[in-house]
Amino acid sequence: MSEKIKVGILGATGMVGQRFVTLLENHPWFELVTLAASAHSAGKTYEEAIGGRWKMETPMPEFVKNMVVKNVADVEDVVKNVDFVFSAVNMPKAEIRTIEEEYAKTETPVVSNNSAHRWTPDVPMGVPEINPEHYEVIEHQRKRLGTTHGFIAVKPNCSIQAYTPALAAWKEFEPREVIVSTYQAISGAGKTFNDWPEMVGNIIPFISGEEEKSEKEPLKVFGRVDEEKGEIVPFDGPLKITSQCIRVPVLNGHTATVFINFGKNPTKEELVDRLVNYTSKASELGLPHAPKQFIQYLTDDDRPQVKKDVDYEGGMGVSIGRLREDSIFDWKFVGLAHNTLRGAAGGALESAEMLKALGYITKK
């Protein structure tokens, strides 16, 4: 068996960083060797740095407890023994943009869960099941950065994961106007009910920045690589998306209710067929975290439900249900995705697996 690729986590003490830690335990391709966080955590063991703030459902893995946390600002020290890093740092966006480029320029690929570089034109915003061809833009990005190995790749916002896969499956029917309302779990804010008690029995009808991301990010996901410009050009067809994003008292799982018009006139049978028979390069390549079936279609009127369906395909699959004709729009449906697995650390990990399979992430 070939030697595993060594990986570090930037922002290892936050909720997404903790999720990366749990996902990387016994990973078949990657070995977690470095943890980095703020100066406040640097120099402590990971267990000391976390203190009582471990937020995962499973206990902290033994292999990380005594790892000494490095200062994320000490770039040269952090990259010493790693082949690439996951970024889940909690900083102002301008600082994230700067530090992620600093890491990339050390010839260390950065796979980021952050939004800071999502609209950098030559940074791919990948969903392995939908747009793996976007990773081709990395060669253009490397020229800009002056690197031969280093680059930045990002994943899209957690809010779009519950409906964008359906739009991708229905691409041939030309989605036009889409109205989406998302009902988003508190873990998306890095919280649990223990540290956000006011969310118990409550709904907050505003999540800063989420509506813009929910409307615009699918357009980059559905865009194309312009080889002349060396960048990703967002989809410029007739697709328009408007959204409302609401925080609800659920721990994990973002639900979306969606109304949609098409340029063509698909039947329900055609729509369901495209969902359940959706295939992708991710499953063909056998990526460790790629779901066997990306999208499941549920026929019961009361599905998808968070309690029953959020962990579909280990939290990496997407559940669609309640597909029916609408009196104003053409069709409507409900989608569900796990926001910290498919929508955050799990999606970033699968992206790294795709980048490794395509030869962009290698041992240094």
Where are these regions (language model features)?
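Charged docking surfaces used in two-component/phosphorelay signaling
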Residues: 187-364
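N-terminal Rossmann-like NAD(P) cofactor-binding subdomain of oxidoreductases
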Residues: 2-206, 240, 323-327, 349-364
